A protein has these predicted regions:
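Short, surface-exposed beta-strand/strand-loop-strand elements in extracellular ectodomains
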Residues: 119-138
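Short beta-strands within extracellular/lumenal beta-sheet-rich domains
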Residues: 76-105
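Extracellular carbohydrate-recognition regions
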Residues: 26-63
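A short beta-strand element within beta-rich, extracytoplasmic domains
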Residues: 97-121
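Extracellular carbohydrate recognition and processing domains
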Residues: 134-164
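Surface-exposed coil/turn segments at beta-strand junctions on protein surfaces, enriched
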Residues: 92-96, 106-108, 147, 160-164, ...
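Glycan-processing catalytic domains of CAZymes
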Residues: 1-30, 156, 160-162, 171-173
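Short beta-strand-plus-loop segments that form exposed binding edges in beta-rich domains
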Residues: 169-180
């Protein structure tokens, strides 16, 4: 068996570069600060915003993540304790719904970015996430037909201290396919 000091910096990137989708049972980020933004319980200094230009965001039929202070009990699943949101996917490049997550970073540094969503019957395979980091943007297409109800790693990025529009994550309802985009 490999230790985390080999798996995280070497083995996981090799597998991902080869096209594998890697789920790890342990945290891959070395950052000691953790920021969680959830639609159910916005935390002080963070912002969760839904913008509707085409339809609305609605609750998903299945439960979603809920932030919990303290320790979890045996068999307690935080991804079954809250709600999640969904919107009808659109092909429009100009009119779409958007969710913005804006953290308040306690210090400048490198932070891993994870997203959560629910996999539902008509989930799209190309949900569009954009990570804004120090004013730069990196866009990802995420297959929401798998990996729902857990944390999905997007990458590790440099962020400035504090809360700023230049440091945020956005999810849009844009897709090349008919279906549903979910967010949690």
């Amino acid at each position: 068996l490999f230790t985390q000091t080999i798996v995280v910096p070497y083995l996981i990137p090799m597998l991902e570069n080869a096209g594998a989708v890697v789920f790890t049972p342990r945290e891959r980020d070395w950052q000691t600060n953790e920021i969680i933004i959830d639609n159910d319980t916005p935390r002080q200094g963070t912002a969760y915003v839904e913008a509707n230009a085409r339809g609305e965001w609605h609750p998903t039929p299945s439960p979603g993540f809920a932030f919990h202070q303290g320790s979890y009990r045996d068999n307690e699943n935080p991804f079954l304790a809250g709600t999640a949101r969904q919107s009808k996917a659109t092909r429009s490049k100009k009119r779409y719904n958007l969710i913005s997550y804006q953290p308040n970073f306690p210090e400048e540094g490198r932070y891993a970015v994870y997203v959560s969503y629910q996999t539902v019957k008509k989930s799209v395979d190309d949900a569009s996430y954009t990570v804004w980091h120090k004013g730069e943007k990196t866009t990802f297409k995420v297959n929401q037909q798998m990996g729902g109800g857990t944390w999905v790693y997007l990458g590790t990025f440099d962020f400035d201290k504090g809360s700023s529009e230049y440091n945020r994550v956005e999810l849009t309802s844009q897709s090349a396919h008919r279906g549903v985009v979910t967010a949690d």
